């Protein structure tokens, strides 16, 4: 477990409060539609927070990391676009308005969401010994576990919805395959993400979706 400074602990408390307000906002019928509009902003703020606390953001030699995450963003977005169009990858689904403007039915922010998930799960295991388990297996499994919860809540937040309101098994399989591909590439490129806020933010986001799910 990382050790946190007083300022870092204060930031973690603020993050928890913001997401707690978000849970209440989505649960209360009167405020639900207003909080749906804030989803893109929260995603962008989460990325900004991670960039700010990234241990290596001011160091040189970051070209590999920049290229890797540009690839994750582009590939993630294009795969989702193809998935929406064909239904062959994840199953039959459509994006709502929860993630903002769309290009050919797919919001560009979903590419940033892939970046966020790869970065978070990478940074959580980076402090541990570098091997295939910590570099690829555990981060990928963590992503699939996160998706298992998020998929149950996404329609309620108007992020996306599934045909017949059923999340197909192939969605989780595809999430796992993409997670392994991205993390394998990251591992081979020796991209290391060190961020003290990665674990707290991941836990808070997971609890956010879980609490909304349990409120149904």
Label the model's feature ranges.
Residues 1-216:
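Aromatic-rich, lipid-facing transmembrane alpha helices and their immediate juxtamembrane interface loops
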């Amino acid at each position: 477990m990382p050790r946190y400074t007083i300022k870092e602990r204060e930031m973690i408390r603020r993050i928890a409060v913001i997401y707690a307000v978000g849970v209440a906002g989505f649960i209360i019928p009167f405020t639900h539609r207003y909080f749906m509009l804030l989803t893109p902003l929260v995603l962008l703020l989460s990325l900004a927070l991670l960039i700010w606390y990234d241990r290596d953001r001011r160091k040189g030699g970051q070209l590999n990391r920049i290229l890797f995450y540009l690839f994750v963003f582009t590939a993630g977005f294009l795969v989702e676009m193809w998935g929406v169009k064909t239904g062959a990858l994840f199953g039959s689904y459509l994006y709502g308005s929860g993630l903002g403007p769309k290009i050919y039915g797919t919001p560009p922010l979903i590419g940033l969401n892939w970046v966020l998930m790869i970065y978070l799960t990478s940074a959580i295991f980076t402090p541990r010994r570098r091997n295939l388990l910590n570099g690829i297996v555990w981060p990928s499994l963590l992503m699939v576990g996160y998706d298992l919860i998020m998929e149950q809540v996404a329609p309620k937040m108007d992020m996306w919805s599934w045909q017949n309101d059923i999340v197909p098994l192939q969605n989780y399989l595809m999430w796992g395959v993409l997670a392994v591909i991205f993390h394998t590439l990251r591992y081979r490129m020796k991209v290391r993400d060190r961020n003290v806020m990665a674990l707290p933010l991941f836990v808070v986001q997971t609890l956010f979706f879980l609490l909304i799910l349990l409120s149904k």
